[in-house]
């Protein structure tokens, strides 16, 4: 059994095609069972569900309208009403940005920024794996990941990393899996990883992690 994980943060407006395609290949060609975990959607939903003080009018309105905004984004007819869509995105992004009171980690519906860590530096990615509990999504995802491991008992975990906006959280997820499920090898793949490996003279700086 292989557990395929789609990490935060990318647009949650469509299913994670990367792990779906891998799952189809593993099941159809290799006859290997696999399970899929959309940690991106789960993590964003958990952050949006948190209670927080309404420090200003905008935040208060966003909190009151949170459930309605989520229904709006899930409604296939919403693109016909751009003003509703825009208001929902602005308000939900407001709540996500306030998820970290210190302002050190800044998520929204399409991106994740860290004021002290860069997805372009391998040393910072390694630090995220070494200290997964410092990642903003750690508390959101720990229970979900543990439940998936308990249910499926995977022999391997695969993490699909396609965009820079996923990199820091993906390595925090790698660190979480290594600490909580140390007997399960982690395989890292995806478009971003492929681009790294195509660089002339590339050497894997993540040996021991993946």
Q: Predicted segment positions?
A:
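Glycine-rich beta-alpha loop elements in corrinoid/cobalamin-binding modules
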Residues: 8-52, 99, 110-210
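Extreme N-terminal starter segment of soluble prokaryotic enzymes
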Residues: 1-3
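Non-catalytic, alpha-helical, charged scaffold/linker segments
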Residues: 36-108
């Amino acid at each position: 059994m292989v557990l395929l994980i789609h990490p935060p943060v990318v647009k949650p407006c469509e299913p994670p095609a990367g792990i779906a395609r891998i799952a189809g290949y593993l099941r159809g060609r290799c006859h290997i069972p696999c399970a899929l975990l959309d940690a991106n959607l789960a993590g964003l939903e958990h952050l949006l569900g948190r209670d927080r003080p309404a420090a200003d009018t905008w935040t208060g309105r966003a909190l009151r309208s949170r459930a309605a905004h989520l229904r709006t984004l899930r409604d296939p007819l919403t693109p016909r009403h751009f003003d509703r869509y825009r208001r929902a995105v602005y308000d939900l992004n407001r709540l996500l940005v306030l998820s970290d009171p210190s302002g050190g980690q800044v998520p929204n519906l399409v991106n994740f920024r860290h004021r002290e860590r860069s997805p372009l530096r391998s040393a910072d990615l390694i630090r995220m794996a070494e200290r997964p509990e410092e990642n903003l999504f750690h508390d959101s995802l720990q229970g979900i990941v543990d439940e998936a491991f308990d249910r499926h008992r995977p022999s391997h975990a695969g993490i699909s990393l396609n965009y820079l906006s996923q990199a820091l959280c993906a390595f925090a997820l790698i660190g979480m899996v290594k600490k909580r499920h140390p007997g399960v090898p982690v395989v890292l793949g995806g478009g971003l990883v492929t681009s790294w490996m195509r660089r002339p003279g590339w050497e894997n700086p993540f040996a021991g992690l993946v």
